[in-house]
Amino acid sequence: MRIEQELKLGFKDVLFRPKRSTLKSRSQVELTRDFTFKHSGRQWSGTPVIAANMDSVGSFAMAKALSEHGVMTAVHKHYTVADWAEFIKENDASVLKNAMVSTGTSEADFQKTKDIMALTDDLIFICIDIANGYSEHLVQYVEKVRAEFPDKVISAGNVVTGDMVEELILAGADIVKVGIGPGSVCTTRVKTGVGYPQLSAIIECADAAHGLGGRIIGDGGCSCAGDVSKAFGGGADFVMLGGMLAGHEESGGEVIEQDGKTFMKFYGMSSQSAMDKHSGGVAKYRAAEGKTVLLPFRGSVHNTISDILGGVRSTCTYVGAAKLKELTKRTTFIRVQEQENNVFGKE
């Protein structure tokens, strides 16, 4: 047993220190980023925010809506090949280039991914997603997928430390997904005692990935636009959002009427609800590691994503970053014990 004494930080532990800026307006800030990925050599240009691959967030409708903003969606893995064929038939490359095909690591998952990717050349992203990215099986699976798809962009995770980021990149991942337990409907840290504060995880994993020419996704922990900015400031190349994009008409969640009000069900992908729906219940050897909540129906996602991106633009003006790419270089975090004045409630 050993104890690491260094304090690790989450988004609530810091604020940006403002800096002199020549920017006169948020409209001058460029949020689009251009990436060329290490292994595939593929290029992608867009706003590096991703809707999470949860079946009450990462729907086909969400992918279509967010593509209008240049934002990506990691489409959840529970759509069939026939569902994908219909989606591809109805949408052009401008939508498909911003849709990630999510997969697990079983042999059936591998075959399904091959079947989906064979439908069109316009799909370029594969998201290999398991809760515990420290499994040697994941590394082997990444190698297998890379051998099968040498020209596709592969994301793999989830992990929270630099050593595993490096191993996954060397195995063939272009992007590593970072985050264990920070999500709003995730209870992994409570059920297992395992995790890592998300901002420190991003800072450390970004350093490891960038040293090898790889990229990272900060996955989870954002509850407001300021947190999204902090993730980018900490070095995340992409930021993945679940709860912030849940509860919308495009989210794909179950709509429930209660006392004349409309709600949408939102749950973690290791929750009782998810396992009842997709696995026939919680296996005897497992514990559910997610919550199920009812969110007030929030209407169209277009307003929400515009508000989030507006907040990130505003962050950039406060620290003098004319481009999102510059934000991490312009970032100085100060440690704090308070974030906001809640006398009239939380924002």
Curated annotation (Swiss-Prot):
InterPro entries cross-referenced by the UniProt entry: Aldolase_TIM (IPR013785), GMP_reductase (IPR050139), GMPR (IPR005993), IMP_DH/GMP_Rdtase_CS (IPR015875), IMP_DH_GMPRt (IPR001093)
SUBUNIT field: Homotetramer.
Keyword Oxidoreductase: yes
Family stated for the protein in its record: Belongs to the IMPDH/GMPR family. GuaC type 1 subfamily.
Gene name of the encoded protein: guaC
Gene Ontology cellular component terms for the protein in this record: cytosol; GMP reductase complex
Origin organism lineage: Bacteria, Pseudomonadati, Pseudomonadota, Gammaproteobacteria, Vibrionales
MF (Gene Ontology): GMP reductase activity; metal ion binding
SUPFAM superfamilies, sorted: Inosine monophosphate dehydrogenase (IMPDH)
Source organism superkingdom: Bacteria
Residues engaged in binding NADP(+): 108-131, 216-239
Function: Catalyzes the irreversible NADPH-dependent deamination of GMP to IMP. It functions in the conversion of nucleobase, nucleoside and nucleotide derivatives of G to A nucleotides, and in maintaining the intracellular balance of A and G nucleotides.
Name of the protein in question: GMP reductase
